[in-house]
């Protein structure tokens, strides 16, 4: 074989073999090189449990994951969520260390018949650090917490389940303990009792973000709402349950029936 042919073969082989491209080659297409609206449309379908890992990929992706627009888009997805909170009464321990929040995650089981299984998944929620107990009620995607524990409080705290963040709302006109009864009627939150004196009722409107007082129940029927073990809203009324008695608050009549 002549030297010229050897040289030709050597040159041709060097042209056919290309060095491997490195991962950080700027010429490579990347997910974040797509328009933001396309990236956000993809991210809204990714479970929140993966967001922390996504934030570590790049600054651009971290910015999109933490953007209010992604939170807004997630609220448009058709889904139902159940939030559960467990607490322990431990003296001199901040509430955020003893409150544990969970949501239900549905998992499809691979069986002959299509079945589902649910499990509790822990979610990080920054509970207000100076409170230890609340009455709570949900309206839409937000959970509202009112009243204190043994010490009466007038504060209102709101948990946005879409973002997992707490914010403080306007305070009630009357400070209340956790013995207050809370119910939701027609999208408004009714807080009944929990005061040291006579029963007083306040109504919070999430749309106007304001409180207003209603006519107090008649004194002779207030006993049905003085203390309660639980409360529930049904048929435009708030029912409170205690040992041996059920109290009924009807906002249309602004009064209480006891039986």
Swiss-Prot record:
UniProt-annotated stretches for the region Disordered: 1-29
Name by which UniProt lists this protein: F-box/kelch-repeat protein At2g22050
Extent of the Kelch repeats: 142-186
Taxonomy, superkingdom: Eukaryota
Comp. bias (Basic residues): 1-12
UniProt keywords, alphabetically: Kelch repeat
Organism for this UniProt entry: Arabidopsis thaliana
Domain spans labelled F-box: 28-76
InterPro entries cross-referenced by the UniProt entry: F-box-like_dom_sf, F-box/kelch-repeat_ARATH, F-box_dom, Kelch-typ_b-propeller, Kelch_1
Cross-referenced PANTHER family: F-BOX DOMAIN-CONTAINING PROTEIN (PTHR24414:SF143), F-BOX/KELCH-REPEAT PROTEIN SKIP4 (PTHR24414)
